[in-house]
Amino acid sequence: MNQEVMNLFNPQVPAQTFDSIRISIASPEKILSWSYGEIKKPETINYRTFKPERDGLFCARIFGPIKDYECLCGKYKRMKYKGIICEKCGVEVTLSRVRRERMGHIELAAPVAHIWFLKSLPSRISTLLDMTLKDIERVLYFENYIVTEPGLTSLKENQLLSEEEYMIAVDEFGEDQFTAMIGAEAIYEMLASMNLEKIAGDLRSEMAETTSDLKQKKLMKRLKIVENFMESGNRPEWMIMKVVPVIPPDLRPLVPLDGGRFATSDLNDLYRRVINRNNRLKRLIELRAPGIIIRNEKRMLQESVDALFDNGRRGRVITGANKRPLKSLSDMLKGKQGRFRQNLLGKRVDYSGRSVIVTGPELKLHQCGLPKKMALELFKPFIYARLDAKGYSSTVKQAKKLVEKEKPEVWDILDEVIREHPVLLNRAPTLHRLGIQAFEPILVEGKAIQLHPLVCTAFNADFDGDQMAVHVPLSLEAQLEARVLMMSTNNILHPANGAPIIVPSQDMVLGLYYLSIMNQNEPGEGMAFSDMGELHHALETKAVTLHAKIRGRYKTVDAEGNPVSKIYETTPGRMIIGELLPKNPNVPFETCNQEMTKKNISKMIDTVYRHCGQKDTVIFCDRIMQLGFSHACRAGISFGKDDMVIPDTKVKIVGDTEALVKEYEQQYNDGLITQGEKYNKVVDAWGKATEKVAEEMMARIKAVEFDDSGRQKPMNSIYMMSHSGARGSPNQMRQLGGMRGLMAKPSGEIIETPIISNFKEGLTVNEYFNSTHGARKGLADTALKTANSGYLTRRLVDVAQDCIVTHTDCGTDKGLTMTAIVDAGQVVASIGQRILGRTALDNIDNPVTGERIVDAGRMILEPDVVAIEKAGIQSVRIRSALTCEIQTGVCGVCYGRDLARGTPVNMGEAVGVIAAQSIGEPGTQLTMRTFHLGGTATVVDQSFLEASYEGTVQIKNRNMLRNSDGVLVAMGRNMAIQILDERGVERSSQRVAYGSKIFVDDGDTVRRGQRFAEWDPYTRPMMTEVEGTVHFEDVVDGISVLESTDESTGITKRQVIDWRSTPRGTDLKPAIVIKDKNGNIAKLARGGEARFMLSVDAILSVEPGQKVSQGDVLARSPLESAKTKDITGGLPRVAELFEARRPKDHAIIAEIDGTIRFGRDYKNKRRVMIEPAEDGVEPVEYLIPKGKPFHLQDGDYIEKGDYILDGNPAPHDILAIKGVEALASYLVNEIQEVYRLQGVVINDKHIEVIVRQMLQKVEITDAGDSTYIVGDNVDRIELEDVNDSLIAEGKKPAFGDPVLLGITKASLQTPSFISAASFQETTKVLTEAAVAGKTDNLQGLKENVIVGRLIPAGTGGTMTQIRRIATARDELILEERRKGTGAESATPMLAAMANDPAAAE
């Protein structure tokens, strides 16, 4: 009852609905229209009465009453006087909450520049006035006068005059001949007198005339700002303020502390400062004070307003009493603690609690154990309501008492309330969406939350003291979503790769693995069982053991559902697992008739999920978990020190390697190899030795041994744990029982002396010391990288947040070509893995039989993948989010399968956020895991090619010679060895490095795993193709070549040094020339002379006058020594790729096909030209720093996209030269390589979604008849819209090239300014948006979260869609009514709209 009465007097104002938010510069009139009165005094509250002072910063007359419906002097109290203004104190009688919304203002005695438009770079004021920021500051801060109207004097407009110069000018010309002003008034006058249309016209004509790039850019920037002002309706002089708004007092509160002191918001101090200076200035002007004093006061006023808006942006930071900088208005918005990120994007919520988690193995997958005390607190309101409804209590107070006393009926009611009411569990850090899942609560005693063991992987939780938070979804809709979308039973697959994530781990795996072992000569071997009853009986009586080889009948059903059975050779343990498998013709007994390692269990769950559906999978998982736990317990697997086996051959292997290392030392001492080569070889030798010891150890541990009775001995426990995937890796076993191997220094270099001992033997002091390096680096890395990884995720989410599935099909004919990824002869990602769940772009036919496998536009499913791989198809064109042509978001067909559901993706799925989480989540995982190996190093270098298929060799661009040893050597730069199968279909194609030894020739057959090429990974050779005598050119000792003698060996080597560093060497071009027997320079086969240019650091392998034959090495350039690769290099690498940074020494890529020619050299650059192969193409020239290792020779043929200079290519170059598809495959492969090294599987489509967001902008190359300027960066969508309207009017459309933006830049350039401002550089984004008068249409997720609406994804997306259709429908009906034809004709259109939401737009 009371509630209804209250509602009478306190009507809820209906919430404003709006579709967009616009931001612009406030004019003084606007500020006054917001204001409820001017603030004249700096006082806040009266220190005796604690009432606000009149006209002060908390004035009740301006801002409203302090208590609800009560004026300040107390004359009018209560509701009945609502709306009356008290004649004594002038306060309106109303709600006190108006103090949160009413604003005031301060009339400034002198105008003041707004610091954002002055100092936020690029400065808007200085760009508009076309003056430097320094000059404007001089005028604003009263250092110089500026001439605004020169009259007939010799002064120029906008000329700065110092005090003395001004005085002199006044003396010379007289005071009224010219006008010079100072301070913000001057800038105000100049801005107010600007004619924007005229300026824009002048700028455009000037741009057409100018030729210099720099000037063009400068004019363009200015033109852009001028046009922004014209379009937005802002006036330039509004950037100078004459009125300062004062925010409502309850947003800058003054709180009494105990002890009579007050805590105040910093803003009050800043406002007080402004008011004080303003009042003083007013008085000084009234008193006609001397100019210098007034100027000083004006300057101080300007500074205090600056501090109010953005403290510390200019000059000294204003500090409070305790030397702490005061928080200005800008600081309220900026950064992690600012309004956006602290209060709008991440709020704390009510109805939540947190506690420690413990394991709950007896729970079902959809349940969690909730402590009773916690549940009682969380569900209090529900309990009160139910107590009231059941008549246990009549008032809330009584209900409260009952609950506090914990009466028995309360517990019964709690049970009722909780039943079927899901709660959300969340474990921080929430790295992906599986970090929050819904469960049904089960009440438990104690104070710990019980968590189902199978969901630990998803939460990345363990039970060593982790805590989790519980949240209660309140509304019916929230409960529904929690149940339907977030329930743990609905999240069986991992959104990043589509593999099951509800997988047994640790104990469970060990138990299942133990259960599925098959041993020889066990009791009961060879028995046969017809059903499970017999089997259990035999096991009970110990007639047979779990691991015996038996024959058993497995009962299942066929496709029609009739029972069938078949006899398998298996073990009782496997039969027990088979008993749990759902009966389905597609889930054969073979899925569990094998050793159940973690991988196989995952595959088994995957099979069950794909064929039996979700419900069966959940039941199956629960039963598998129970089985795993019970058998892990019964097996009693444990290990002691004797389980770590040290191989007997270790001593010999170490001895051999030590001898080898001695030999390398000797070679180095004899000068046959350099220091660097020796280092590489030693490291290599020890690396191989470590591997060998590890292999021997594994062989020993794996070995099957029999006891005296001929029964197989039990398996080694450590091996069981590692092999099953329960705990421990071969690497850790190697350190326990093999040898620890090589260690890395913190810099990433490898220490030459390895650790020969293992942990069982114990380390020597030196070894221990060496190993501390790596271990400490691991710990330091972890701390640093966690932060970096989180930041990467944040940037990814920000760039991709508005990528949502908006349509079913965009109908594009573009796509990407997918092929298998082969690395070092191993297939790392088969074509099947890459195309599964994607949509085929073209029809896929079997190349031999010609039968159709997949129709174009259909999704490629598991059976299709098998067929495609069987048919030996090498490349498949698929649709991709990257090439999707929908304007906003992506379409379902281009995206393909929703990995977390295994079905085509739903409308409204937020695929951008999922992609960002999938890429960011492993980043953190990996960085947290670097140190487990204790910094054990691995050398990663490939030096050979192996055939990955059988078939016939075909060599593309064949260019080989036999050298003096009779071995074939590759002399071509773009030679590729292809392997064809018997049908002549290409199975693999691999490029061969220059100088490789080739062991096959055209037409040879190879078998799988056969080596067909190898090379030295540490040096790059320079070889001759003609025979003759060696001569040196410009090889001058001490200038271009240094002969260094190694002290320890007395051997000299000649190495090319940087010859440009000495004055005498600037014009040298060191080269080796081959002359024929007549003493003339030999001719090469392809034309040109046999002159080989040397690059810095090359080591000469020949002497002058030496005879050489084809294929001999003249010189070799060392490559840097192998550094170890781990994700530490990996995470920054991923960030570098997503930020699209140019690598430090980036590769130079050929822009056209053609022949290499050397031109005239510059001082320290070498000029390389490409003569185009086709006519009508301009030759391209490149300048290459002379010292760079440059391996092309005059006359080499090079293809478009080949590297002229090695290194990492810049992604922008790939985009410009080879196009979007090449860029996509480069970025996807490079990023995937980093993750693959760590064994993380991420689906390509996630990376493609992010790359799509990086390619949203276009740079205008031809403006056509549009208003764009060449060089403008515009949104792709915007350009398409403009072009459509231009073409409709019969005008010339504009053209542009796609631009690649890094993720930070792309996030800041989103169409939504709210989203950009909440990401980074808040002040800059808001300044820019205000000048341009931008409108935010609230299309992404972030903007909607910030303004507090449902996000336009998932269920929210559907609501938005319905709302949109409804408005369209209303408009249509109104339109029809207007025409006067009645509403009938609109109905068929509406029906069509309801069926196809896309049409409604």
Swiss-Prot record:
Residues reported to bind Zn(2+) 2: 810, 884, 891, 894
InterPro entries cross-referenced by the UniProt entry: DNA-dir_RpoC_beta_prime, DNA-dir_RpoC_beta_prime_bact, RNA_pol_asu, RNA_pol_N, RNA_pol_Rpb1_1, RNA_pol_Rpb1_3, RNA_pol_Rpb1_3_sf, RNA_pol_Rpb1_4
Regions of compositional bias (Low complexity) in chain numbering: 1391-1401
Subunit structure: The RNAP catalytic core consists of 2 alpha, 1 beta, 1 beta' and 1 omega subunit. When a sigma factor is associated with the core the holoenzyme is formed, which can initiate transcription.
NCBIfam families tied to this protein: rpoC_TIGR (TIGR02386)
Family in the record: Belongs to the RNA polymerase beta' chain family.
Protein name (database record): DNA-directed RNA polymerase subunit beta'
Organism of derivation: Sinorhizobium medicae (strain WSM419)
